[in-house]
Amino acid sequence: MSLGAWEVKVSTNFPQKVATGIAQLDEQIIGAEYDAVAYLGSQVVNGTNHAVLAQQTILTGRDTKNAVVLVFNEKPKTIEVALASINTIVKGNNEPGGIDVNVTTEIPAEAKAALDAALKGFVGSKVEAFAYIGKQVTKGIDYIFACEVTPVVQDPVKTISLVKVHSIDNTLEFKALFSDEKNNTKLGYAFTW
């Protein structure tokens, strides 16, 4: 891994300092709750940044849910991590046609079937869903996943992407969050469909 680049390393196990930081979030932030789902990777820059996929619940009368990437920073020679940023990657909306966010690593059977159907015959990249983000009812049902996408080439650059499956016609839409690429130092976010 080169200095400043993200190293993709998806896991449902969190480094100890990151797990402690996650546990303290609900005490530190008023008006929202966070449910961490997956560790996405790390970046070495001014210490070590750690990216975590989570569900954010805004505590209002409607309890809106969003998919977010939490970035924690671990400074050298410190015993804890600090929350550096909260990046909204999918905004939930309780209105008709809005995205019903329910971030989980337990992918619902109907969503998995839609993804499998859309990936049938798909070539060029290996797409592995590690989390279900939610669904949207428009013309048919669209499902959104967090996936590891690895091109089928020599020396592939793995990417963490949001993948939207349009189940009515079995098509896919990709939005990259970040990758292993040497020069990729930014975490992309704030997507709206």
Can you annotate each of these PLM segments?
Residues M1-W193:
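N- and C-terminal low-complexity/disordered segments
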